[in-house]
Curated annotation (Swiss-Prot):
Organism placement in taxonomy: Eukaryota, Viridiplantae, Streptophyta, Embryophyta, Tracheophyta
Protein name per its UniProtKB record: Transcription initiation factor IIB
Pfam families in the record: TFIIB, Zn_Ribbon_TF
Keywords, ordered alphabetically: Metal-binding, Nucleus, Repeat, Transcription, Transcription regulation, Zinc, Zinc-finger
Chain's gene name: TFIIB1
Organism of origin: Glycine max
Subcellular location: Nucleus
Zinc finger (TFIIB-type): 2-34
Per-repeat ranges for Sequence: 116-193, 217-291
GO molecular function, one term: RNA polymerase II general transcription initiation factor activity
Residues given in the record as Zn(2+) binding sites: C6, C9, C26, C29
Any GO CC annotation of this UniProt entry: transcription preinitiation complex
PROSITE patterns in UniProt: TFIIB (PS00782), ZF_TFIIB (PS51134)
InterPro entries in the record: Cyclin-like_dom, Cyclin-like_sf, TFIIB, TFIIB_CS, TFIIB_cyclin, Znf_TFIIB
Length: 313
């Protein structure tokens, strides 16, 4: 339900949408406020034919403003019966496939972004933002000859940053169909440059904080709720100190400290695998954090005497 102004009730009232008739009806007086409306969202009901093919949706997917004509098109389907109609339909279908589709490459790119997003468990808003970034880059007609997989992965990386749900380059790389971290990094710089030229100013990427990765990293290590809470508090306190390490490295080092103070200690190798940070980098970050552990680690999680049991770097 939603609210709309009813001319009979003379005020905002709740309205009901009658999908079968396409009418918007006032829930209080029954006045039809709008009739024969078209629902542009997907229709999930399917209508089977007798040919044994997959059930087609009668309306199909919602319109996509990034595609020509909103992505809406006419498809010549096979007839249910046999005879000459089937020959005519198949002939028309071949001609349709031969026709130029300006969005064919774009649709394939969007499918690839959707697949990568699904594999990383990203929300739809990030996928849509990545699609928008890719479309803007493609409209400039300057990306030919570049690694397509790296370009799409970089669009997804930037979208995650802009939606305040950052992922590490290594995480993006794991679903990038073979594109390397170096290639994705180059593609990211290229996209930022192109979009900056388009807008006339720098592209806002969003600020990365160590806490952005903490819950996911802890989940990868199957840490208990108490340890996760302590790690989140510790990484937040660490921002008060001038620790010149990347947020991801700080997150990994904090996890190492928290697990060393618990009964469920995690080997450095496991933390490295879960966070994508090299063991040597974690050690160096731990060395920088060590002088501040008494102020970083929550008192409810570890006492002063517990902190003395930590290994000196």
């Amino acid at each position: 339900m939603s609210d709309a102004f009813c001319s009979d009730c003379k005020r905002q009232t709740e309205v009901v949408f009658d999908h079968s008739a396409g009418d918007t009806v006032c829930s209080e007086c029954g006045l039809v406020l709008e009739s024969h409306s078209i629902d542009e969202t997907s229709e999930w009901r399917t209508f089977a034919n007798e040919s044994g093919d997959n059930d087609p949706n009668r309306v199909g997917g919602p319109s996509n403003p990034l595609l020509t004509d909103g992505g809406l098109s006419t498809v010549i389907a096979k007839p249910n019966g046999g005879g000459g109609g089937e020959f005519l339909s198949s002939s028309l279908g071949r001609w349709q496939n031969r026709g130029s589709n300006p969005d064919r490459a774009l649709i394939q790119a969007f499918k690839t972004i959707a697949t990568m997003s699904d594999r990383l468990g990203l929300v739809a808003t990030i996928k849509d933002r990545a699609n928008e970034i890719y479309k803007r880059v493609e409209d400039q007609k300057s990306s030919r000859g570049r690694n397509q997989d790296a370009l799409l992965a970089a669009c997804l990386y930037i979208a995650c940053r802009q939606e305040d749900k950052p992922r590490t380059v290594k995480e993006i790389c794991s679903v990038a169909n073979g594109a390397t971290k170096k290639e994705i990094g180059r593609a990211k710089e290229y996209i930022v440059k192109q979009l900056g030229l388009e807008n006339g100013n720098a592209v806002e990427m969003g600020t990365i904080h160590a806490g952005d990765f903490m819950r996911r990293f802890c989940s990868n290590l199957c840490m208990n709720n108490q340890a996760v809470k302590a790690a989140q508090e510790a990484v937040q306190k660490s921002e008060e100190f001038d620790i010149r390490r990347s947020p991801i490295s700080i997150a990994a080092a904090v996890i190492y400290i928290i697990t060393q103070l618990s009964d469920d200690k995690k080997p450095l190798k496991d933390i490295s695998l879960a966070t994508g940070v090299a063991e040597g980098t974690i050690r160096n970050s731990y060395k920088d954090l060590y002088p501040h552990v008494s102020k970083i680690i929550p008192n409810w999680y570890a006492k002063e005497e517990d902190l003395k049991n930590l290994c000196s770097p």
